[in-house]
């Protein structure tokens, strides 16, 4: 069962990916994570990527796709995988399709979590963090005492990129980047869009109902 997971910031994509990993026993593959792992381990492609990263440049698609191909060939991807954060552009989607054909692991389904902007802005701009790693939400999960962490007693704060204006900018970028991919996979007949406004467990049940066809 080979899956691509799309969803804007705040849609709960990370939460659902983790639940899918636990339930199906297939790995979540985040391009950021495997890129950092290759750099850390000093692989040939990792060193090539590092040369660009050190200059503050984007890692070229051909380097990134090589790293992804190697990861998808590992034993834990035998029964499937969840691609998270890739592809980001139509050329990347074409390159991905080419390597998946080569290793005979085509994508079964592209899952797209859809949540209205106003809900996402509310979810993200209400987030509060603590330096100890605890997280809260002004409405759904506030600390017991205003601005004080329940766990360590430290001051909770809002991240600079979690303000309503910053969140809307991130959503605009996401839509501009992702819409062509939504159209790309819709044309291929493998896109399924889900309502991400429901409760976490309800969304997960919806996901499982869709994936039952491929398990």
Curated annotation (Swiss-Prot):
The keyword DNA repair does not apply. Disulfide bonds: none annotated. ATP binds at residues 10-15, 127, 135-136, 198. Residues 30-59 are annotated as: NMP. It catalyses: AMP + ATP = 2 ADP. It comes from the Archaea. Zn(2+) binds at residues 130, 132, 149, 152. Pfam families: ADK (PF00406), ADK_lid (PF05191). GO terms for molecular function: adenylate kinase activity; ATP binding; nucleoside diphosphate kinase activity; zinc ion binding. One of its GO terms (biological process) is nucleoside diphosphate metabolic process. Pathway: Purine metabolism; AMP biosynthesis via salvage pathway; AMP from ADP: step 1/1. InterPro entries: Adenyl_kin_sub, Adenylat/UMP-CMP_kin, Adenylat_kinase_CS, Adenylate_kinase_lid-dom, Guanylate_kin-like_dom, P-loop_NTPase. Its EC number is 2.7.4.3. One of its GO terms (cellular component) is cytosol. PROSITE patterns: ADENYLATE_KINASE. Monomer. Consists of three domains, a large central CORE domain and two small peripheral domains, NMPbind and LID, which undergo movements during catalysis. The LID domain closes over the site of phosphoryl transfer upon ATP binding. Assembling and dissambling the active center during each catalytic cycle provides an effective means to prevent ATP hydrolysis. Some bacteria have evolved a zinc-coordinating structure that stabilizes the LID domain. This is Adenylate kinase. The gene is adk.
